[in-house]
Amino acid sequence: MKAEIIAVGTEILTGQIVNTNAQFLSEKLAEIGVDVYFQTAVGDNEVRLLSLLEIASQRSSLVILTGGLGPTEDDLTKQTLAKFLGKALVFDPQAQEKLDIFFALRPDYARTPNNERQAQIVEGAIPLPNETGLAVGGKLEVDGVTYVVLPGPPSELKPMVLNQLLPKLMTGSKLYSRVLRFFGIGESQLVTILADLIDNQIDPTLAPYAKTGEVTLRLSTKASSQEEANQALDILENQILDCQTFEGISLRDFCYGYGEETSLASIVVEELKRQGKTIAAAESLTAGLFQATVTNFSEVSSIFKSGFVTYSLEEKSRMLDIPAKNLEEHGVVSEFTAQKMAEQARSKTQSDFGISLTGVAGPDSLEGHPVGTVFIGLAQEQGTEVIKVNIGGRSRADVRHIAVMHAFNLVRKALLSD
């Protein structure tokens, strides 16, 4: 089924509102195996909408129109579709009853004739009830093309799509997806490594997406059941993770989790809870961002004891009992300082882990280190590990954000090695 989405509304063309409905519809249609080939926006103009309907009817088997179902003069979607199909507009009894109730409960509201238009549908259409508004939607098939009209406000469109439209469009197959999350490898390198799989993909498919500090891979397949989809996605996932970087490192080492909402922080927090271990932090350039990220999750008092924000040399010495002369000798941006910060954070809070971050967020260099230089220390019973990462060419906010991601990844690896 080839689908086309037509957004009706001059306010979209003038930039007054963003057409989020198209993104939502495309995503939900893809989940049930319906491919969207075209997205178009047209103003509140009958002639131009008629022209667009003529084009859409020739190239698409499902035409979805959003917006223009309200009571005002420029709400002309249903009227124009009826004219295009040579059909009349008729009243939907359920929608009329909803109008009756609405105005009965609001005696101060004037029930003007134009309000009645919201209860009309194209003759022969299946009504799509509006759970949160008054304008009824509709679904109609004519000459092999299915036409759907939906309200423009997302608060009305979304429940109508989820509860009314999608169940009526369901076919034998659906689109199933799996998201793999990678940290420590760039999108360009990952795409180069997976070039053969990407170039030769048919079904399942894979698509890379770069995000701040990480890369995700979306694996998708059309199948009649979750079990059937899992078989296909498992094969593709193993093919991906069996690949190696140019240095011979397996991609499995970079894949940290699954899903749209998963993050390095959520993985670490859950693993700390599972293992019953605690962590403390001492932060300089990130100014408490690691600690704030941990405490964004609920019920973390069992794993997070306390922390330190030691932005200046003096506070590193005072709060963490690191001799000032040693800090001056080695520099605040150094392996030594990261090591001592982590060890003192762990010792002072009696935690299983102590994590530290010190570096140069920018915009200026510090102690001869370029912007983006970060030292991260992780102290635990077995000893202390310090890594140096270079996060160059980024904004100050991105340097801090990615540094925290590196810190969580360091903790994650330590937890997995236990």
From Swiss-Prot:
Membrane-spanning ranges: none
CDD domains (alphabetical): cinA (cd00885)
InterPro entries: CinA (IPR050101), CinA-like_C (IPR036653), CinA_C (IPR008136), CinA_KH (IPR041424), Competence-induced_CinA (IPR008135), MoaB/Mog-like_dom_sf (IPR036425), MoaB/Mog_dom (IPR001453)
Highest taxon in the source lineage: Bacteria
Taxonomic lineage: Bacteria, Bacillati, Bacillota, Bacilli, Lactobacillales
SUPFAM superfamilies: CinA-like, Molybdenum cofactor biosynthesis proteins
Coiled coil: none
Protein name (database record): Putative competence-damage inducible protein
Pfam (any one): MoCF_biosynth
Signal peptide: none
Family, similarity comment: Belongs to the CinA family.
Listed SMART domains: MoCF_biosynth (SM00852)
Organism: Streptococcus pneumoniae (strain CGSP14)
